[in-house]
Amino acid sequence: MLAVDVEKQLGALKLAVRFDAARGATALFGPSGAGKTSVVNMIAGLLTPDRGSIAIDGTVLFDAARGIDVPPHRRRVGYVFQEGRLFPHLSVRQNLDYGRRMSGRPRESSEFERIVALLDIGHLLDRRPRMLSGGERQRVAVGRALLMGPRLLLLDEPLASLDVAHKREILPYLVRLRDDAGIPMVYVSHTAAEVRRIATTVVRLDAGHMVAAGGLELLDDADIDGLD
C-alpha cells in the first residue's frame, strides 16, 4: 500500500494531495498543470515536499515532521519517464542490465527472461535504442525499471510522446504488466482513454488538489480520446 499525504508550494501553485494506492494501477488523472508529475517526483524522491509524509507498505520514505527523507536510490521505486531515457550507446540488453546493477541486485537469468517475455522484447536485445520504435523504447524502459526490483512502479505519461499507432502497440503490455507483474503502479495521464484501459483506481487532480478518488466512473464526464 502506498500512502501519500503531501503539500508543496510550486510557484503560484499550492499542491496539497492525499491518497492511498493499493495493488493494481492507480491513475493520477487531470489537466496539464494539475500537479501530477510533481506528485510522482515526490514519491520518487526527486522533489521534496514542504510538509507531509509518504510510505510504502508501512516503510516511511518521507516524513517532514520526523526529519525522514530516504534518498531516491534507496526507495526501491521504478520510474518510467515520458521519453524512456535509454542510454543510446548501450544495447537493449545492456540498458536492461543497467537497472539491475544500479539496484545492486545479483544477476538472475530467470527473472531477466521473465521480464523480457512479459514485455515481448527478446528479439530486440542486441539492438541500440535508435533502431527501436517509440513503443519498443518504452517497453525497454519499463523492463529496465522492473529489473531494479521495485516495490512500486511510477509511469509518468509514458505514451505522451507516441502517435496513436504506437500507443495501441504498447497499451496491451501495460495491461499485462498491471495484471501479471504483481507490483503496484501509479500511472500519470491526462488522457481518459488511456486511463480507462489501464487503471483500477482513479485519483483526479485539478489545480494542485485531489478533487475525487474512486473507480473508473470518475472518468464519465471526461473527454475520451480515441484509441480503440
Pin down the residues of each PLM region.
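ABC ATPase NBD coupling module
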Residues: L61-G78, M102
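A short, proline-enriched helix->beta-strand linker immediately N-terminal to the Walker B motif
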Residues: L147-R151
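Helical segment within the ABC ATPase nucleotide-binding domain
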Residues: R168-A181
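Catalytic Walker B motif of ABC-type/P-loop ATPase nucleotide-binding domains
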Residues: L153-E157
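Conserved ABC ATPase signature
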Residues: R128-L132, E136-Q138
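Conserved H-loop
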Residues: G182-V188
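Conserved ABC ATPase "signature" region
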Residues: T59-A64, R107-L124, V175-R176
